């Protein structure tokens, strides 16, 4: 018997949820810029703000807590509102393989609710990435502290986190830039990241990168960077790659030692082996020795001279923790007793000493080794041993 199998192409479902006022603006920006292949959701405690949202799905958080009037810049109110609606949050996220959470940190709804939404998504087994902004310095130290606390809470529940300091907008665009243009520039970072991931997953390539590769690179990786670059001309591969990894709006993160790197190259049929190699060589410069690196290529017949590069780098700024040294003084002393005679015997063997019984030789060597080991002047670690353990050993 032959069993008929439906030949339906399964593609990963990507959802973008904007939380609070800043997140709602980002979702509106993406919807107007025709970012395809994703579903948009907007969640807010302010019922009035949800009326002007272009997202297909809107979620009013915590009507019992806030009465639809917002969180009043209080993150705890935003948190309680999200906790009240955990079930509804899980309903709107149902079916997603990957979720982007975007918000402006420092306010009430975004700072308080975003970590709860991330927690729900992770419990559902969804790959969760957050793209957040930090407030301007002139907004006050208190708002900055609230933002930093929210970012730390969010980092505990997301797989990867991208941070955009609003201060960079002023540095890069200048004081004469319009406010709308400045915030649109920040929203472009999110739009570029989502569009890039969507293209990677949904567009089959000659050297294919699928959702499993994305999940491998981004799961449990912490700080991340996403960028896209486009260039044409004889040096297009190098220029596009450098543009992708040098986004001036992103938080100052050290690309050196990235533990996960995903690269997708999109070009016409004239893509050369040398250009493919140029992209790889630039990526290799900041990759960790043990990094997981995946490079995909899409050949688009409609592209002429342009070459697009999308780079996802994760695990940035990671530091290997030093292993905890557990000192057991009794075991340490016996190890020194066993190792010290063996080391001396390897250096010079006193054959006359062999006439003495082994137990006597070990006692004499062991007492000297123990005395040397337990000398506080020679080993400051000795002072870290609790006094009662030191007395037992002595």
Curated annotation (Swiss-Prot):
GO terms for biological process: cell division; division septum assembly; FtsZ-dependent cytokinesis; protein polymerization. GTP binds at residues 21-25, 108-110, 139, 143, 187. One of its GO terms (cellular component) is cytoplasm. Disulfide bonds: none annotated. InterPro entries: Cell_div_FtsZ (IPR000158), Cell_div_FtsZ_CS (IPR020805), FtsZ/CetZ (IPR045061), FtsZ_C (IPR024757), Tub_FtsZ_C (IPR008280), Tubulin/FtsZ-like_C (IPR037103), Tubulin/FtsZ_2-layer-sand-dom (IPR018316), Tubulin/FtsZ_GTPase_sf (IPR036525). GO terms for molecular function: GTP binding; GTPase activity. Pfam families: FtsZ_C, Tubulin. SUPFAM superfamilies: Tubulin C-terminal domain-like, Tubulin nucleotide-binding domain-like. The keyword GTP-binding applies. It is found in: Cytoplasm. Keywords: Cell cycle, Cell division, Cytoplasm, GTP-binding, Nucleotide-binding, Septation. SMART domains: Tubulin, Tubulin_C. NCBIfam families: ftsZ (TIGR00065). Homodimer. Polymerizes to form a dynamic ring structure in a strictly GTP-dependent manner. Interacts directly with several other division proteins. Interacts with the SulA inhibitor. Formation of the FtsZ ring is inhibited by SulA. PANTHER family: CELL DIVISION PROTEIN FTSZ-RELATED, MITOCHONDRIAL DIVISION PROTEIN FSZA. Essential cell division protein that forms a contractile ring structure (Z ring) at the future cell division site. The regulation of the ring assembly controls the timing and the location of cell division. One of the functions of the FtsZ ring is to recruit other cell division proteins to the septum to produce a new cell wall between the dividing cells. Binds GTP and shows GTPase activity. Belongs to the FtsZ family. This is Cell division protein FtsZ.
């Amino acid at each position: 018997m032959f069993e008929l199998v439906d030949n339906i192409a399964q593609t990963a479902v990507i959802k973008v949820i904007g939380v609070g006022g800043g997140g709602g603006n980002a979702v509106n920006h993406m919807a107007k810029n025709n970012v395809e292949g994703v579903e948009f959701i907007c969640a807010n405690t302010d019922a009035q703000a949800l009326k002007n949202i272009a997202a297909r799905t809107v979620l009013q958080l915590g009507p019992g807590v806030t009465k639809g009037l917002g969180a009043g810049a209080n993150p705890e109110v935003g948190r309680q509102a999200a906790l009240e609606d955990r079930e509804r949050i899980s309903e709107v996220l149902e079916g997603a393989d990957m979720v982007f959470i975007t918000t402006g940190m420092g306010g009430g709804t975004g700072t308080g609710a975003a970590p709860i939404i991330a927690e729900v998504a992770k419990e559902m087994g969804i790959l969760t990435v957050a793209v957040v902004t930090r407030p301007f310095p002139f907004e006050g130290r208190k708002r900055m502290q609230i933002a930093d606390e929210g970012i730390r809470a969010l980092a505990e529940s997301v797989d990867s986190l991208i941070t955009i300091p609003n201060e960079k907008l002023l540095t890069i665009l200048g004081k004469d830039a319009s406010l709308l243009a400045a915030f649109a520039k920040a929203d472009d970072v999110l739009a570029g990241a989502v569009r890039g991931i969507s293209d990677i997953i949904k567009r089959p390539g000659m050297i294919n990168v699928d959702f499993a590769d994305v999940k491998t690179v981004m799961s449990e990786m912490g700080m991340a960077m996403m960028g896209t670059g486009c260039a044409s001309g004889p040096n297009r591969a190098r220029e596009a790659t450098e543009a992708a990894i040098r986004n001036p709006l992103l938080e100052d993160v050290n690309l050196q030692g990235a533990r996960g790197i995903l690269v997708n190259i999109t070009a016409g049929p004239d893509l050369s082996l040398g250009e493919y190699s140029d992209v790889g060589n630039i990526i290799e410069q900041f990759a960790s020795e043990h990094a997981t690196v995946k490079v995909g290529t899409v050949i688009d017949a409609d592209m002429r001279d342009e070459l697009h590069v999308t780079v996802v780098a994760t695990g940035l700024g990671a530091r290997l923790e030093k292993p905890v040294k557990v000192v057991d003084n009794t075991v340490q002393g016996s190890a020194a007793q066993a190792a010290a005679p063996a080391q001396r015997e390897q250096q010079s063997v006193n054959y006359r000493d062999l006439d003495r019984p082994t137990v006597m030789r070990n006692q004499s060597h062991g007492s000297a080794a123990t005395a040397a080991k337990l000398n506080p002047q020679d080993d400051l670690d000795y002072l870290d041993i609790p006094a009662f353990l030191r007395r037992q050993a002595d």
